[in-house]
Amino acid sequence: MDTITVEKRNEQLKAKQLRRKGIVPCCIFGGSLPNSISIQLDEKSAEKLLRKLRLGSKIQLKLEDQTIITQIKDSRRCFADNKIEYIDFQALNPKTKVNSVAHVILENTDYVTGVLDKLLMEIPYASLPEDMIDTVTVDLEGKPVGTIITVGDIPEFLSDHIDLQVETDSIVLRIAEKRNAAAQDTEQAAE
């Protein structure tokens, strides 16, 4: 699990002023915290964090003398310049189940001969913090046209420690035949 150092937010400055100085306003809430904590993170660290991790990823925040285990709950970017506006972290209680999402990463997409339809690339689930899944990898090498992969086909989601918030027969992806090839086959059959 990654660890990142954060500092308490300067309450005298508004969020807009912080962003101009290259600082991203953040917030930690939930878990065993009595109140939410306003924190700040420099922009370079925030960019690096969101490049490496995703929403739902577990991360340790080092704030002064304490370490808080959290997950990235939300973030927003400015539409105009694509800079991070804020990041929200949810503190995790080790004994309480938490809602999160697992991201599906596809490998060997170059080997797919048909059209790859990605239908459900974020799988919502609930689990204890120790059982959280950040990403699952699906290898597409050797998968023929007509292949359908459901949530139940991914072994990580069959664990008793995970409560899926979608049906196991929900389609994650399918490999369809290319439309041009189907049209040509129909024309050849007609001749």
Indicate residue ranges for each PLM-predicted region:
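Acidic, negatively charged sequence tracts
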Residues: 1-191
